[in-house]
C-alpha cells in the first residue's frame, strides 16, 4: 500500500509539472496570503518557508477606503546577496495582472537595493505582495541562517481619517528606532503621516519600552479583543486587549497549511512587567485570577470552512462558589487553515468601448471585446461570447460602375470558311454619385472554319434580341444562318427567324406617372408609381436624396416628400472627422477635453433646427463616439459637459423633428441607439460622482436623475420623478407618470460583494415625446404613454421585489392597454423590441395604467388603436358641405346683386357694412370647400387655414361694426370720415392683426394638419379663434343692451336739460311735419323715429344673426376636424343655409328702405337733381351722408319762415348755419311719384306751401318776441299763401286764389336749393338794393288772400336793407351756386328775394331799419362757418329754435285795426310782376282739389298750455364749440 501511495504521489506531481510548469508549481506551493490582521512582524523564513524562487507573501487590506497599510523593512542584519525582494501593490488578485505588472516593472520597489537600514512603505490598495526572486540557475538556499529567524518585516493597519492611539504609538516606535540606528540622521527615517504626533519620550503614551519588545514577533488578528486598536478613542464597547502574550507555536506546530500561515498569539497588557518564561508557561492554562472557580479551556472547535482560511473557537465556564466574579475572557478564537483550496470561477472583465465604425461610409461594423479571468482550483470557465458586434451605417458610399466579366465568345458567324466572333460585357449601374464604366463594351475577332461543303445546313440559333417594348407586350427575335447555300445554291429547309412575345405587363397610365417636378432646387424626372427617383443632396450636404412616386387612394400618382436620410451636412461631417483627430492625440486628458469641445459644437448645430434627417443619425453616432471615448479614457465630464449632452438629446427629440426621424429610421433605427447611448453616459457620469451625491438634469424633452448610493444607505424606496424639486420643468411637474424603486433591489449579484463598500449608480430618465420617434409598430398598436427608463450599475441581484410603475395615457379611445418593457435580446442586431415578459398589468382605467415589473429596463404602455380613427383624405369635399355652402353663398350673392341694383337709393353706412359682412361669409364658405381638397399639399393647406381663420373672425367683427354704427346713430355721435375708416379697421383690421400675431408666434405650426385644413386642436392654437370670437360676442351684447336702453328712454329727447325744460307735450314739434311727403321735409320727431327704427332693426339683426353665425362656424369646425361624423356635416349644412336666408330676410325683404327703393325702381324714378349735383359737389361725385347729416340737412331746409321783418334775418341767419356737413355732401332726389324718402334727406323740394301770417303789417321789435303767451283769439285770422317752386311747372300762369281761412296753422319756409339769382349793386356802397327783378323767375306764387287783407304794391327802388359791411362783398352773379358752407348767405338772399313782393306801405310800417341794424350788430361777431362736433348740440339748437317760433306764432298775431278798417285791396297789387304772356314756357297750375289739398295741408302744433319758454337770442345760445 505504501508503494502504491508513493506511486500516486509521483504521478500527481509529474502531472502538475507537465500541466503548469515548474515555475507555476513553485508558485502554487510557496504562496502565502494573510488577511484579517491589523499588526504583525515576520521573519524571512516565516514569509518564505520553501526554498523556491518567485515565492510570494501577500497581505490583504481589510478596507482600502478606510485603512492604509504601513510596512517597515529592516535591512540592517539581512544579507540580500543571494536573492532579491520585490514589493508592489494591486487591486485585483489575478495572476495575469500580476504578471503584467512584473513585466512592465512599474511601481515595483526593490527592497534589497535600498541604501538605508530601514525602509518604510505605505500602501492603499487591496493587496500588498512581497516576492523573493533568486538569480537564474541559482540552486537556492541550502540552509537557513540566523538572520532568517529575526523579524525583518513589520506591518500596521492604520485608519486614514482618525488613527488609533495604538497605531500612532507603533509608528512613533518605528521612527525612534530608526533615529537611534541612524545616529540622528532624519533624512533616512521619513514616515509621511501627519495625523499622528509623536511625543518626545515614549513614556508619555503610558507604555514603557519594555512592553514594546513584547510586540515583536507577534500577529494581532482583527477580532473583538483588538477592535479598539483601530479607533482613536476607546468606547465602552471596544477594547484593545494586549494583557497577555501569545508566543508563536513551536517548530513542530508551525508550518504551512495550504497557502496560509498559522500564527497564534497570547494578548498581553502593555503595562505588565516582563515575567520569566517558565512562569509564563506554568500559568498558560491557569485562570488569570488564580481562582478555583474558572474551569479549563475546552478543545478547539472544527474549522469554520472546508476550504480556505477559517476560524476555530474554544470556551470555558466560570464557577465561583464564593460569589466573586471571574476575570479574563470566556471565549477565544484563532485562525485555521484548511488544505483544500476553494475553486475560483472565471470572471468576465468589463466590456471594452465600442470601436469606431469599420467604414466611413456604407454599412460597417462596430466591435467590442472582453477578457475572462481564468478559473482556478477547478472553477467554472466564463460563459458567453468574448466578442460583440453590431452594425453601423453612417452614409452611403458612392458606387462607381464596374465592368462585369467578359461573356464567352459567340459562335463563329459562319459554320464554314472564315468568320467573326463577338463577346460583350455589362457595366453595373453607378449609384450615389459614382462614375460610369470606361472602355468598350464589346470585342470581336476572326474565326477560322473548314471550307464550306456542297450542301446547305442551318447553324445554331442566335440569342434572343431585346424586347421591342418595355411594357404592354413587345416582340423579341432570334435568327440562324444557312451554311453552304452560296456555294451549292441550295437553300436550307425551314425558317431562319423566330419571334415571341415579351414584357406583357401593363404600362402605367399617364395619371400613374409622376410628372417632372422642380422642388428644392432639384429636378425630379418622370417616374412611374412605386419607383424611387434619386438626386444629389443640396450643396451644403453630401450624399444622395430620394423621392418616391406613390399612388393615391384614387389611383393618381403623386410625389411624396423627398427623403434626406442619406444627406449629411458638411458641419456634421467635419465634426465627425474632428473626433478622430482628438483620438489620435493618444493622451487621456487631451482626448477627454476634446470630446467636451465636440459636445459644445454639436449643441450649437442642433439648436439651429435646420439640419437634415441624415444629420440626426450622424448626431447619434457622434454621441456614441463621445461616450465611448469618455469610457475608454476614464474621463469624467464636467457638469457643463453633462448638461450640454442632455440638451443635445433634448434638441434631437424635439417634436418638430418627428418627420425627420420617420425619414431617418427607414435606414437605421437611430432612436433606439440613442436610448442605449444615454444609459451608458449616465453610468459614466455616476461612477465619477461622490457617494450619496445625486444630479438632476432637466431639459425641454428629457428629465434625468443620476444617483450614487451605497447599498447600506438605501433605507427607503426611491420615487422618480421628484415633482417638488426646484427648477423642475412644467411638463414633468404636471406629469402623472411615476416609478417606485424598492430599497430591497439594491443587492449585488454575489452575496460576498454586499458590504459597506458596495456602491450602486442609479439612473432614471423620463422622455417627453420619445414615443413619437420610435419605429412604428404593426397591427394598429401604438405607444400610449411617455417612456421611462430605470437602470442600475452594477446589475443588482434578482429578488422578489417589483418596480411599481404608473403611466398616464396619451390618447383616449384606445383599446386593451398593457405594460411592456424593452428587451434587447430578441433581435439579431441587438436593437431590441417591446416585450411583456417581466411586466404585468395590475390596474388600468381610462386615463392610467399601473404595472409591476421584476427587472430594470425601459417601460411604456402599448394599446390597440381602432382602425376607424385613422382618417384618410378623400380629395373632394362631401356632398353635404357642398350643398350647405352653396345655398348660403347663393342667398348672399342674390342679396349683393339686389343691393347693387338699388345702390343709388340705399347707399349708406349700414349697407356698406352689410356688403362687407356678406363678403366675409362667402369667402369662408369657399375656403371650407377648398380646404377639404388640399390636405396633402402642405403649403396650400397652411395658406387656406390662415385665410379661413381671418374670414371667420372678420364675420364676427362686421356684426360688431353694425352694432357700433347703431349705437353711434342712437346716441348722436358725429360720424366723420375718420369714424368710417375706423369701421373698416374694426371689420378687416382687427382679424388681420389677430391672424398675423398668431402666425408670427407659431411660425405656421398648427395651421393645417395631415387630416384637415384648420387650426390644430393640440397646443392651444384654437384659442386664437375662440378667444377673439368670444370677446366680440360679449362686446356685441353690451352694445346691444346700451342701444336698447337708449331706445326706450322717455320721449326720445336726447338732452336731459331740454327734457326737463320741455315739460309735458302731447306731440312735440309735430307742427313742423308736412303732410306732403313729396317735399322730403320731416320733423325732429320723424327723424328720431327713423333713427330708432334703423337701430332697432340692427339690434334685431344682431340678436338673430350673431347666434346663428356662432352655431354655423362651430359646426363647420367640427365637420372639418372630424370627417367620420356625418352629423356635424348635416348641422353645418343646415345652419349655413339658414344663415344665408335669414340675412336675406332681415336685410333685404323686411327692410323698408329696400322696399321703397325697389318700388321706385319699378316705376322708373329719376333723380331731379342730377343736373344740379355738380354745383353741390365740386369733385363731381357724391359722398355718403351719415344719418345725422341727413337730419341736419332736413332741418336746415325746413325751418319755419317767419316773415317778421328785421327779426327774421337776424334770428334765422344766426341759427340755421349748415353745421357739421361735409363739403362734398350728396343730395338725393325726390320721387315725383309720391314715394316717402324720409330716410333720404336733402331732397329737392318740388312743392312748398307757405302760409303767410296775418300780422305781417304789424310792427314788432325783438323785445316783443319775448312777451308772454297772447290770447288765442288774437291770432284766429290768418292769411295763407301757397308757394310752389316745382321746376317742372315753369309754364304755370299766375293766378290768385281766394283765401280760405285756416285756424291755428303754423308758417313754414323751405331753404332754397343750391343757387339764387341776385342782382348786383350798381354802386359800391355799403348797402344792397334788392328789387323784384332779383326774384327767381322759375317760381310761381299762388296767394290765398283774405278779402279784408290790404296788400299794396311794393316799390322796390325804395326798399333798401342796410346790411353790415361784411355782407357787401358776398354778392353773386346770376345763376352762380352757393357753397354749402355759405348757407347763411343763401338764406339771406332768399329772404330778400321773398320780401320783394311786399308792398311799400307794409315794408315801411313793419320793418324798423334801426332795429335791424341793432340786431345785426349783435351777431356780427359770430363765426357761423365753424363746425359743431356733437349731435347733442345740434339737436338742442334745432329744437330750441323751433320752440321759439312756435311760441311766436301763437302770441304775436294781434289784429291791426287800421288795416281792418280799409279792407279794399290796392288796385294795383301785382303791377310789379311782369305779364305772364312774356313767359310762354310756363303752364298754369290748377287749383288743388280737396284730396290734394288735404294731402298737403299743414298740421299745427297744439300745445296743452302756454309755455313759459323765453325767446332768448343771446349769443351764448348759438355759439358753436370748435
From Swiss-Prot:
Disulfide bonds join 30-55, 303-336, 307-342, 318-326, 357-392, 361-397, 372-382, 412-447, 416-452, 427-437, 467-502, 471-507, 482-492, 514-549, 537-567, 819-851, 839-853. The chain crosses the membrane at residues 881-901, 911-931, 940-960, 982-1002, 1024-1044, 1099-1119, 1126-1146. GO terms for cellular component: cerebellar climbing fiber to Purkinje cell synapse; membrane; plasma membrane; postsynapse; postsynaptic density membrane; synaptic cleft. GO terms for biological process: adenylate cyclase-activating G protein-coupled receptor signaling pathway; cell surface receptor signaling pathway; G protein-coupled receptor signaling pathway; maintenance of synapse structure; motor learning; myoblast fusion; negative regulation of angiogenesis; neuron remodeling. Residues 902-910, 961-981, 1045-1098, 1147-1522 are cytoplasmic. It comes from the Eukaryota. The modification Phosphoserine is found at residues 619, 1220, 1411. One of its GO terms (molecular function) is G protein-coupled receptor activity. It is found in: Cell membrane. Residues 1-24 form the signal peptide. Keywords: Cell membrane, Disulfide bond, G-protein coupled receptor, Glycoprotein, Membrane, Phosphoprotein, Receptor, Repeat, Signal, Transducer, Transmembrane, Transmembrane helix. It is a multi-pass membrane protein. Autoproteolysis appears to be cell specific, does not readily undergo proteolytic cleavage in HEK293T cells. Forms a heterodimer, consisting of a large extracellular region non-covalently linked to a seven-transmembrane moiety. Interacts (via TSP N-terminal domains) with C1QL1, C1QL2, C1QL3 and C1QL4. Interacts with ELMO1, ELMO2 and ELMO3. This is Adhesion G protein-coupled receptor B3. The lineage of its organism: Eukaryota, Metazoa, Chordata, Craniata, Vertebrata. The gene is ADGRB3.
Amino acid at each position: 500500500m505504501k508503494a502504491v501511495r508513493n506511486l500516486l504521489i509521483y504521478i500527481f506531481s509529474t502531472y502538475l509539472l507537465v500541466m503548469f510548469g515548474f515555475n507555476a508549481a513553485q508558485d502554487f506551493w510557496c504562496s502565502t496570503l494573510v488577511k484579517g490582521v491589523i499588526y504583525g512582524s515576520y521573519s524571512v523564513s516565516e514569509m518564505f518557508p520553501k526554498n523556491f524562487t518567485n515565492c510570494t507573501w501577500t497581505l490583504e487590506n481589510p478596507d482600502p477606503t478606510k485603512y492604509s497599510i504601513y510596512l517597515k523593512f529592516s535591512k540592517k542584519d539581512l544579507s540580500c546577496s543571494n536573492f532579491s525582494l520585490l514589493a508592489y501593490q494591486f487591486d485585483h488578485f489575478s495572476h495575469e495582472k500580476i504578471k503584467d505588472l512584473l513585466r512592465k516593472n512599474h511601481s515595483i520597489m526593490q527592497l534589497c537595493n535600498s541604501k538605508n537600514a530601514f525602509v518604510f512603505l505605505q500602501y492603499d490598495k487591496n493587496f500588498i505582495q512581497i516576492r523573493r526572486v533568486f538569480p537564474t540557475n541559482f540552486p537556492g538556499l541550502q540552509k537557513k541562517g540566523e538572520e532568517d529567524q529575526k523579524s525583518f518585516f513589520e506591518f500596521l493597519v492604520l485608519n486614514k481619517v482618525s488613527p488609533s492611539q495604538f497605531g500612532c504609538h507603533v509608528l512613533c516606535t518605528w521612527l525612534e528606532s530608526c533615529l537611534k540606528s541612524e545616529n540622528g540622521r532624519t533624512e533616512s527615517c521619513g514616515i509621511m503621516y501627519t495625523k499622528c504626533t509623536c511625543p518626545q519620550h515614549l513614556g508619555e503614551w503610558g507604555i514603557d519600552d519594555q512592553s514594546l519588545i513584547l510586540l515583536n514577533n507577534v500577529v494581532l488578528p482583527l477580532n473583538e479583543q483588538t477592535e479598539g486598536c483601530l479607533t482613536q478613542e476607546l468606547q465602552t464597547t471596544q477594547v484593545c486587549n494586549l494583557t497577555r502574550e501569545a508566543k508563536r507555536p513551536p517548530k513542530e506546530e508551525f508550518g504551512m497549511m495550504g497557502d496560509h500561515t498559522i500564527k497564534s498569539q497570547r494578548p498581553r497588557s502593555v503595562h505588565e512587567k516582563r515575567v520569566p518564561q517558565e512562569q509564563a508557561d506554568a500559568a498558560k492554562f491557569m485562570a488569570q485570577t488564580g481562582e478555583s472557580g474558572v474551569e479549563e479551556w475546552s478543545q478547539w472547535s472544527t474549522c469554520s470552512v472546508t476550504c480556505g482560511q477559517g476560524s476555530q473557537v474554544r470556551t470555558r465556564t466560570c464557577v465561583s462558589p464564593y460569589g466573586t466574579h471571574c476575570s479574563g475572557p470566556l471565549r477565544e478564537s484563532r485562525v485555521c487553515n484548511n488544505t483544500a483550496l476553494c475553486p475560483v470561477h472565471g470572471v468576465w472583465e468589463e466590456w471594452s468601448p465600442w470601436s469606431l465604425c469599420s467604414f466611413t461610409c456604407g454599412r460597417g461594423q462596430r466591435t467590442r471585446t472582453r477578457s475572462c479571468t481564468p478559473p482556478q482550483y477547478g472553477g467554472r470557465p466564463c460563459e458567453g461570447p468574448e466578442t460583440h458586434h453590431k452594425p453601423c451605417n453612417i452614409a452611403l458610399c458612392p458606387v462607381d460602375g464596374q465592368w462585369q466579366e467578359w461573356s464567352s465568345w459567340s459562335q463563329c458567324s459562319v459554320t464554314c470558311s472564315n468568320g467573326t466572333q463577338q463577346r460583350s460585357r455589362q457595366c453595373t449601374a453607378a449609384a450615389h454619385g459614382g462614375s460610369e464604366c470606361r472602355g468598350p463594351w464589346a470585342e470581336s475577332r476572326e474565326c477560322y472554319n473548314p471550307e464550306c461543303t456542297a450542301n446547305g445546313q442551318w447553324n445554331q440559333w442566335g440569342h434572343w434580341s431585346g424586347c421591342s417594348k418595355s411594357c404592354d407586350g413587345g416582340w423579341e427575335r432570334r435568327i440562324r444562318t444557312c451554311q453552304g447555300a452560296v456555294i451549292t445554291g441550295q437553300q436550307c429547309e425551314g425558317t431562319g427567324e423566330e419571334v415571341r412575345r415579351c414584357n406583357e405587363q401593363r404600362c402605367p397610365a399617364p395619371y400613374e406617372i409622376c410628372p417632372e417636378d422642380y422642388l428644392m432646387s432639384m429636378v425630379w424626372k418622370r417616374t412611374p408609381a412605386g419607383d424611387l427617383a434619386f438626386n444629389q443632396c443640396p450643396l451644403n450636404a453630401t450624399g444622395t436624396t430620394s423621392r418616391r412616386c406613390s399612388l393615391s387612394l384614387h389611383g393618381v400618382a403623386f410625389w411624396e416628400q423627398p427623403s434626406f436620410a442619406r444627406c449629411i451636412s458638411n458641419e456634421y461631417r467635419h465634426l465627425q472627422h474632428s473626433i478622430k483627430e482628438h483620438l489620435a492625440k493618444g493622451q487621456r486628458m487631451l482626448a477627454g477635453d476634446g470630446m467636451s469641445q465636440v459636445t459644445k459644437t454639436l449643441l450649437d448645430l442642433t439648436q439651429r433646427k435646420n439640419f437634415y434627417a441624415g444629420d440626426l443619425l450622424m448626431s447619434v453616432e457622434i454621441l456614441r463616439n463621445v461616450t465611448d471615448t469618455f469610457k475608454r479614457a476614464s474621463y469624467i465630464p464636467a457638469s457643463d459637459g453633462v448638461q450640454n449632452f442632455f440638451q443635445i438629446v433634448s434638441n434631437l427629440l424635439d417634436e418638430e423633428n418627428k418627420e425627420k426621424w420617420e425619414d431617418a429610421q427607414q435606414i437605421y433605427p437611430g432612436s433606439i441607439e440613442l436610448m442605449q447611448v444615454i444609459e451608458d453616459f449616465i453610468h459614466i457620469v455616476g461612477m465619477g460622482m461622490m457617494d450619496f451625491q445625486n444630479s438632476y438634469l432637466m431639459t425641454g424633452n428629457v428629465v434625468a436623475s443620476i444617483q450614487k448610493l451605497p447599498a447600506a444607505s438605501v433605507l427607503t424606496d426611491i420615487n422618480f420623478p421628484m415633482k417638488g424639486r426646484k427648477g423642475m420643468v412644467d411638463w414633468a411637474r404636471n406629469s402623472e407618470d411615476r416609478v417606485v424603486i424598492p430599497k430591497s433591489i439594491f443587492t449585488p449579484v454575489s452575496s460576498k460583494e454586499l458590504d459597506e463598500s458596495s456602491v450602486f449608480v442609479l439612473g432614471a430618465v423620463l422622455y417627453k415625446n420619445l414615443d413619437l420617434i420610435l419605429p412604428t409598430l404593426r397591427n394598429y398598436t401604438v405607444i400610449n404613454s411617455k417612456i421611462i427608463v430605470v437602470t442600475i450599475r452594477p446589475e443588482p441581484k434578482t429578488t422578489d421585489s417589483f418596480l411599481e410603475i404608473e403611466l398616464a395615457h396619451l390618447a383616449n379611445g384606445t383599446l386593451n392597454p398593457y405594460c411592456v418593457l424593452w428587451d434587447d435580446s430578441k433581435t439579431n442586431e441587438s436593437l431590441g423590441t417591446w416585450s411583456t415578459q417581466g411586466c404585468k398589468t395590475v390596474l388600468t382605467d381610462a386615463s392610467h395604467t399601473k404595472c409591476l415589473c421584476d427587472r430594470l429596463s425601459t417601460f411604456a404602455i402599448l394599446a390597440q388603436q381602432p382602425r376607424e380613427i385613422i382618417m384618410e383624405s378623400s380629395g373632394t369635399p362631401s356632398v353635404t358641405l357642398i350643398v350647405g355652402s352653396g345655398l348660403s353663398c347663393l342667398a348672399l350673392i342674390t342679396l349683393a346683386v339686389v343691393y347693387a341694383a338699388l345702390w343709388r337709393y340705399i347707399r349708406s353706412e349700414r349697407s356698406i357694412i352689410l356688403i362687407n359682412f356678406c363678403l366675409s361669409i362667402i369667402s369662408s364658405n369657399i375656403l371650407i370647400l377648398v380646404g377639404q381638397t388640399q390636405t396633402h399639399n402642405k403649403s396650400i393647406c397652411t395658406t387656406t387655414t390662415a385665410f379661413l381663420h381671418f374670414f371667420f373672425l372678420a364675420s364676427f367683427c362686421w356684426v360688431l361694426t353694425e352694432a357700433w354704427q347703431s349705437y353711434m346713430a342712437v346716441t348722436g355721435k358725429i360720424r366723420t370720415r375718420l369714424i368710417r375708416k375706423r369701421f373698416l379697421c374694426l371689420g378687416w383690421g382687427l382679424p388681420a392683426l389677430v391672424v398675423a400675431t398668431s402666425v408670427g408666434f407659431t411660425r405656421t405650426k398648427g395651421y393645417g394638419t395631415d387630416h384637415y385644413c384648420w387650426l390644430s386642436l393640440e397646443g392651444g392654437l384654437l384659442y386664437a379663434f375662440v378667444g377673439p370670437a368670444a370677446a366680440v360676442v360679449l362686446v356685441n351684447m353690451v352694445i346691444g343692451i346700451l342701444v336698447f336702453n337708449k331706445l326706450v328712454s322717455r320721449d326720445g329727447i336726447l338732452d336731459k336739460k331740454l327734457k326737463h325744460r320741455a315739460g309735458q307735450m302731447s306731440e312735440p314739434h309735430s307742427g313742423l311735419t308736412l303732410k306732403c311727403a313729396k317735399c322730403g321735409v320731416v320733423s325732429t320727431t320723424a327723424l328720431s323715429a327713423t333713427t330708432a327704427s334703423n337701430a332697432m332693426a340692427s339690434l334685431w339683426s344682431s340678436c338673430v344673426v350673431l347666434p346663428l353665425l356662432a352655431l354655423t362656424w362651430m359646426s363647420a369646425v367640427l365637420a372639418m376636424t372630424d370627417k367620420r361624423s356625418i352629423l356635424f356635416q348635416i348641422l353645418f349644412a343646415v345652419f349655413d343655409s339658414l344663415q344665408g336666408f335669414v340675412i336675406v330676410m332681415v336685410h333685404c325683404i323686411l327692410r323698408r328702405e329696400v322696399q321703397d327703393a325697389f318700388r321706385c325702381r319699378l316705376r322708373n324714378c329719376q333723380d331731379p337733381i342730377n343736373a344740379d349735383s355738380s354745383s353741390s359737389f365740386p369733385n363731381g361725385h357724391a359722398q355718403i351722408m351719415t344719418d345725422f347729416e341727413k337730419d341736419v340737412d332736413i332741418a336746415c331746409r325746413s325751418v319755419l319762415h317767419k316773415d317778421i321783418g328785421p327779426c327774421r334775418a337776424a334770428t334765422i341767419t344766426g341759427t340755421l348755419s349748415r353745421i357739421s356737413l361735409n363739403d362734398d355732401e350728396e343730395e338725393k332726389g325726390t320721387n315725383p311719384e309720391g314715394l316717402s324718402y324720409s330716410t333720404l334727406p336733402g331732397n329737392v323740394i318740388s312743392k312748398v306751401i307757405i302760409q303767410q301770417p296775418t300780422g305781417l303789417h304789424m310792427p314788432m321789435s325783438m323785445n316783443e318776441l319775448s312777451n308772454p303767451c297772447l290770447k288765442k283769439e288774437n291770432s284766429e285770422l290768418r292769411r295763407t299763401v301757397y308757394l310752389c317752386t316745382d321746376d317742372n311747372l315753369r309754364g304755370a300762369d299766375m293766378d290768385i286764389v281766394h283765401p280760405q281761412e285756416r285756424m291755428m296753422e303754423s308758417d313754414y319756409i323751405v331753404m332754397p336749393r343750391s343757387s339764387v339769382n341776385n342782382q348786383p349793386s350798381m354802386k359800391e356802397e355799403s348797402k344792397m338794393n334788392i328789387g323784384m327783378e332779383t326774384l327767381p323767375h322759375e317760381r310761381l306764387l299762388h296767394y290765398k288772400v283774405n278779402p279784408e287783407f290790404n296788400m299794396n304794391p311794393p316799390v322796390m327802388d325804395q326798399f333798401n336793407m342796410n346790411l353790415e359791411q361784411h355782407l357787401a362783398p358776398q354778392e353773386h352773379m346770376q345763376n352762380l351756386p352757393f357753397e354749402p358752407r355759405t348757407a347763411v348767405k343763401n338764406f339771406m338772399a332768399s329772404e330778400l328775394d321773398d320780401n320783394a313782393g311786399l308792398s311799400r306801405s307794409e315794408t315801411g310800417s313793419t320793418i324798423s331799419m334801426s332795429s335791424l341794424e341793432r340786431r345785426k350788430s349783435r351777431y356780427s361777431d359770430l363765426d357761423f362757418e365753424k363746425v359743431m362736433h356733437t349731435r347733442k348740440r345740434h339737436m338742442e339748437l334745432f329744437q330750441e329754435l323751433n320752440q321759439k317760433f312756435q311760441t311766436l306764432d301763437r302770441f304775436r298775431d294781434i289784429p291791426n285795426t287800421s288795416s281792418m278798417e280799409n279792407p279794399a285791396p290796392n288796385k294795383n297789387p301785382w303791377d310789379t310782376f311782369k305779364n305772364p304772356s312774356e313767359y310762354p314756357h310756363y303752364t298754369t297750375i290748377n287749383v288743388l282739389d280737396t284730396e290734394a289739398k288735404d294731402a298737403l295741408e299743414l298740421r299745427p302744433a297744439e300745445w296743452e298750455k302756454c309755455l313759459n319758454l323765453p325767446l332768448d337770442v343771446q349769443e351764448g345760445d348759438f355759439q358753436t364749440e370748435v
